[in-house]
């Protein structure tokens, strides 16, 4: 039986779901430790022999996935009911069976986007380049397939298939089946003419040029952000990593019923 590292925040500690989870782990004599996401200054030892168990919503799931990526440990995300797109319902899974061994049929590879070959800041949903000034557009240039397109917009989203129902969709992008493993380029409030989105194959590389004198931020899954002021043209390359993160899923099907119920309210 592997050691469990529970990743959550204070508001979930008080939930009945957290209590039920702890009771299950205690009854099976499963060794576990707890990481409080509200206390990011603490150092925790996580190794590849652990299973990271994220308890919460999609934000918690993404943070758990980043921890899993950095520590090369598989991840199981659990949320309340069917609220989240990235989480399993505790009622729908056999937790003991999943955690007793690494059952290959329940492991699904998730491939993040990486920036400039930097693997410590993976993005499993999307990377966003967005303006910091409310009144000034960004001047961007997109390079892919040995072609380039200029774009003036509030920003740009580079999304995975997994993240296609997140910010990508809010900005008018398409929903893509997660198993397709694509890259999606979607502009944010474009001023110049630009397709609503461009869907690229998994082997594609995207280079973005941000013109000089731009005030902008780069956001990774909404949980990490870097602010920049460009004194000269700046270039960023985005591609899908050659490595994957193993994530436990009881049912690897898109939650279209959940998604459509949300947007048709």
Regions found by a protein language model. Give the residues of each.
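Short glycine-/acidic-enriched loop or helix-start segments at secondary-structure transitions
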Residues: 16, 63-65, 86-88, 139, ...
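Short glycine-rich anion-binding loops that position phosphate/pyrophosphate groups of nucleotides
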Residues: 57-60, 81, 162-165
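A glycine- and small-aliphatic-rich helix-loop capping segment at beta-alpha/alpha-beta transitions
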Residues: 69-73, 91-95, 172-181
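ATP/NTP phosphate-donor binding region
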Residues: 1-51, 55, 63-70, 90-106, ...
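Gly/Ser-rich helix-loop-strand patches that form or flank binding pockets
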Residues: 63, 67-80, 85
